Swiss-Prot record:
Encoding gene (name): recO
One Pfam family, short name: RecO_C
Name under which the protein is recorded: DNA repair protein RecO
Organism: Syntrophobacter fumaroxidans (strain DSM 10017 / MPOB)
Classification via InterPro entries: ARFGAP/RecO, DNA_rep/recomb_RecO_N, NA-bd_OB-fold, RecO, RecO_C
Entry's Gene Ontology BP terms: DNA recombination; double-strand break repair
C-alpha cells in the first residue's frame, strides 16, 4: 500500500471510538483529506501535541478506503499566537470551517494550501485579524472560481472607474452601477476604492496582498456580507461563527 509524505494543516479533530481520532486535513499534495489516527488518544508518543487544529505538520499516511491512515506526524509550526487571543482563534477556526465546507476532498490545489498556511501566519503577526480574514476570503473566492471580474456593471456594461458607488450582489456575482437599482437586502454597497482593493486581492502575489488595508467602516459590512454568501452556498450555519461572536461580546 502506497505511503505518502506531505505537509498538511490540521483543520479539525474529533474523537472516534475508544482510542482513535478523526482528523480533517488540508495537504499540499492531496488537497483536503479525512484521516484517522489510530490509538492517538492513548499513545503519548506517536502523535503527541501534533494534531492540534490550525497547526502545520509533516504527515506520513497511506490511503485505505475513504480515510487516510496516519502513520506519523511531525509538528512544523504550531502557530501558538492564535491560541492567545479569542478573536484570532475564532477567525482561524472560521477559516478552517470554510475550507472544510467548501473545498471538495481529494482535489490538490497547492496554491490554496499556501494561502491557508500564510493566512494562519498572518493571523499570528497582524493585529488586524478581521483584515486578514477578508483578504483570505477574497483570495479564496478567486482560487475557487467564485470571485467575479468586478470590471464593469453586470447589467449595462458601464466601466468600474466611471462611478464611485456600486452595489455587489455577492450570491449572484452581480455588480451593478447606480443606474440600476437592485435588491439591497443581500447586497453590499461599496465604493470604488474598496472594489479596486478587492481586485488587487486577485492580482497581487500572495506575499504582497497582506499590505492591503480595508477601511475600518467597511470591514464589518464586508465580513458579514461574505459570511452570508458562504452560508448561502453551503446551506447551513457556520458553527465557529458563534465562537467569534462570543469573542466580540467579551
Amino acid at each position: 500500500m502506497k505511503t505518502t509524505r506531505t505537509e498538511a494543516i490540521i483543520l479539525n479533530t474529533r474523537d472516534h471510538g475508544e482510542s482513535d481520532r478523526l482528523v480533517g486535513l488540508y495537504t499540499r499534495s492531496g488537497g483536503r483529506l479525512q484521516g484517522i489516527a489510530k490509538g492517538a488518544r492513548r499513545s503519548r508518543k506517536r502523535f503527541a501535541n501534533t494534531l492540534e487544529p490550525c497547526s502545520l505538520v509533516e504527515l506520513q499516511f497511506r490511503e485505505k478506503g475513504t480515510l487516510v491512515w496516519l502513520e506519523s506526524c511531525k509538528l512544523l509550526e504550531p502557530f501558538l499566537s492564535l491560541r492567545t487571543e479569542l478573536i484570532r482563534w475564532g477567525i482561524a477556526a472560521l477559516i478552517s470551517e470554510i475550507v472544510i465546507e467548501m473545498v471538495p476532498e481529494g482535489d490538490p490545489q497547492p496554491e490554496l494550501f499556501e494561502l491557508l498556511k500564510e493566512t494562519l501566519r498572518q493571523l499570528c503577526e497582524d493585529k488586524d485579524s478581521l483584515n486578514v480574514a477578508l483578504l483570505f476570503i477574497f483570495r479564496f473566492q478567486d482560487k475557487m472560481g467564485y470571485l467575479p471580474a468586478l470590471e464593469n456593471c453586470g447589467i449595462c456594461g458601464r466601466s468600474l472607474r466611471s462611478a464611485t458607488k456600486w452595489c455587489w450582489q455577492v450570491d449572484r456575482g452581480l455588480l451593478a452601477c447606480p443606474d440600476h437599482p437592485v435588491e439591497r437586502v443581500r447586497a453590499l454597497e461599496l465604493d470604488l476604492g474598496t472594489l479596486l482593493l478587492i481586485r488587487q486581492c486577485r492580482s497581487l502575489s500572495l506575499d504582497r496582498i497582506w499590505r492591503l488595508r480595508f477601511l475600518h467602516d467597511t470591514k464589518v459590512q464586508l465580513f458579514y456580507g461574505l459570511l452570508d454568501w458562504v452560508r448561502g452556498h453551503i446551506r447551513k450555519e457556520l458553527k465557529s461563527l458563534k465562537l467569534l461572536q462570543q469573542a466580540h461580546s467579551t
